Amino acid sequence: MIKEVVKRDGTVVPFEKNKITMAIYKAMLSVKNGTMKDAEQLADKVVARLKDKERPSVEEIQDVVEDVLMTSKIDGKTFTDVAKSYILYREKRRAIREEKELMGVKDDLKLTLNAVKVLEARYLLKDEDGKIIETPRQMFRRVASHIGIVEALYDYIKYKKTGKVPENAEIIGKVSPTQEEVLRRAFGYMKEDGIIEGTFEEFMDFIQTKGTSAGHYINRFEEVMSSLDFVPNSPTLMNAGTKLGQLSACFVLPVGDSIEDIFETLKNTALIHKSGGGTGFSFSRLRPKDDIVGSTKGVASGPVSFMKIFDVTTDVIKQGGKRRGANMGILNYNHPDIMEFILSKDSENKVLSNFNISVGVTDDFFDKLDNDDYVDLVNPRTKKIMKRIKAREIWDAIIDQAWKTADPGLIFLDEINRKNPVKNVGDIESTNPCGEQPLLPYESCNLGSINLSKYVVDGKKIDFDRLRETVWTATRFLDDVIDANKFPVEQIKKVTRMTRKIGLGVMGFADMLIKLEIPYNSWEALEIGEKVMSFINDESHKASQALAEERGVFPAWYGSEWEKEGIKMRNSTTTTIAPTGTISIIAGCSSSIEPIFALAFVRHVLNGQELLEVNPLFEEKTRELGIYSEELMRQVAETGNLENVKINEEVKKIFVTAHEIDPQWHVLMQATFQRYCDSGVSKTINMRSDATREDIARAYRMAKDLHCKGITVYRDKSKTVQVLTAGTAETKKPEEKEVIELVTKMPDKYLKIDSTFDPACPTGKCDK
């Protein structure tokens, strides 16, 4: 009788007959032959054939399954077609395993092939000869061990105050050299902050004699990552457990109006990019082009010329060869060089390839635009008006360039600062490269995202209890990252630890909707987004409040908006919606809150490599419906969508893709998540190649009216090289009638999102 099974990697696991049954049933569904009862009977035959083996291998079991399918007959039915489907699937899995082995990766988490390719190129540790020396699970263990060990410091602080050790404490005999380095550095941070007593040697004696809960949290952190329920940002995955030790994804650096300040910032940028971080800047302090330079009596070259220097530096660094550097460049709308800035990424100029650019706009700009008024272009050095220009002229230039090149986007500065919980520290003038994280000068933030596709149970409901557990674990993890971090610049350490911002976000939202059988472009989808994100935001706040009771409030809490409301928080912000481009590949889910880009598409990653992807949920659905075929997959791959494919209309609605969705639905979804997000939302408003400038203007204005903090559009094929390509053929644009109907149907709750009721404003009493 079978008791255990030997897996391909040699590990032994308990035998589960149901796995055989489901494998057979899935093959039956793909050819529309057989029932669950048939599958159960065939599985019984497989088990009977193996009755003399107590511990067969996976390969042995699969060989018997093939033979049973080829030779069995039930009620006159034969299953040779099912056997063929099973054999083809088995062969496909074998080819994938072989390709993973050729990459030198031992995949102990059964990740997708694309995930393994990304891990092999960027994340898994290698020796001096370039040979991979860890598995994906070991990578997550490395990260968990680096982050979780700082729990020991808080156990020590508590012990010094109360004389108690945690109930789950375990004595640590010896920590690794890397863990000791993390502890020594974090101990120093806490000593500077005045929250820890004694010497480092006394602390080490404590964990080796009294014990710590660090082991418990290390295991929990590893579990939540290895299950792909939660994945932290790329620098944490790449640098945790290494000498580099820099764990944050996003930074904002100030750019002062002097050569000394500019090149000090450039040096800091290089250090950040070397460690895998991205940087955001406002160049609005720089004197305009042709302004006088006091020291030489010459003329200034202006912000755009200095941006080019930052761009070239980024290109040279290439973040240690692991990923391309990224920058956000912002210039306020009333800077004298605003028109040059807006045109700086025109295809004719071909500069700033390592920059996203956005115009910083305020409520005053939109007032002038609505009243057809003039904007005063003010020299930031002298504060004098250099020129007056119609707001409409600036707006038209922004829209025209966004249509041509997808840049610039908009950053709504007043909206950001209305929701700034630490006004006592300063105003926010910039964001990280993708726009989701508004930050103070010298501030950094570490991000991580929950894979929502993992929380749909029974095909119809969301497991909020398990989601709550993950939110609390992830919030604790991200707070620990701040202490485990090795900051590239002293000032960044100071500001980051002062505000302790963290950014918990989501990915796999489109997958969640598909599993729930809800179209992305529907009011029901907006309601799900609202329900899920409000839950995550509330629970992350509760988790941060619990950490504040346990560890203390963030230092800048005193005088903050949180203190005014009497709410003790460990972190000034807790939620951010990041784009999750790479970590969603690792997790095997859809990106961020984006719809599916295509059901079949080519993804350009890793310096020119291409990954061909077919959506696994679509493949699963077609097999379930018994309509899967290679011919159908090839047909879908022509455009990446189902618009011209003869298939069930309900399936078409559920598997709607980004370019089939009217831009207004994209903006509505961004606004819905923004209402329940402390920081910002990175979302691309995808448009078809034949979208008009009016479409872009409508989306930009809608984002402002719905209290988004920024907006980026992308008209298909508006860049010469784009990250995602869907199929090879064009699809027709929805009729204008659909757009008109959409606007007519829009309920007040989404048209009139008042900032005083926005949960992204922590107190609910933000100034208008």
UniProtKB/Swiss-Prot annotation:
Domain of life from the UniProt record: Archaea
Keywords: ATP-binding, Cobalamin, Cobalt, Deoxyribonucleotide synthesis, Disulfide bond, DNA synthesis, Nucleotide-binding, Oxidoreductase
Main enzyme class: oxidoreductase
Keyword Glycosyltransferase assigned: no
UniProt cross-references to CDD domains, sorted A to Z: RNR_II_dimer (cd02888)
Catalytic activity: a 2'-deoxyribonucleoside 5'-diphosphate + [thioredoxin]-disulfide + H2O = a ribonucleoside 5'-diphosphate + [thioredoxin]-dithiol
Cofactor note: 5'-deoxyadenosylcobalamine (coenzyme B12).
E.C. numbers: 1.17.4.1
Active site: residue positions: N432, C434, E436
Cofactor: adenosylcob(III)alamin
InterPro entries in alphabetical order: ATP-cone_dom (IPR005144), RdRp_reductase_class-2 (IPR050862), RNR_lg_C (IPR000788), RNR_lsu_N (IPR013509), RNR_NrdJ/NrdZ (IPR013344), RNR_R1-su_N (IPR008926)
GO terms (BP aspect): deoxyribonucleotide biosynthetic process; DNA biosynthetic process
GO molecular function, one term: ribonucleoside-diphosphate reductase activity, thioredoxin disulfide as acceptor
Disulfide pattern: C250-C445
Record domain ATP-cone: where: 3-97
Positions contributing to substrate binding: S234, A249, C250, G278, N432, P433, C434, G435, E436, P579, T580, G581, T582, I583
Known partners and oligomeric status: Monomer.
Family, per entry: Belongs to the ribonucleoside diphosphate reductase class-2 family.
Function: Provides the precursors necessary for DNA synthesis. Catalyzes the biosynthesis of deoxyribonucleotides from the corresponding ribonucleotides.
Stated name of the protein: Vitamin B12-dependent ribonucleoside-diphosphate reductase
Species this chain originates from: Thermoplasma acidophilum (strain ATCC 25905 / DSM 1728 / JCM 9062 / NBRC 15155 / AMRC-C165)
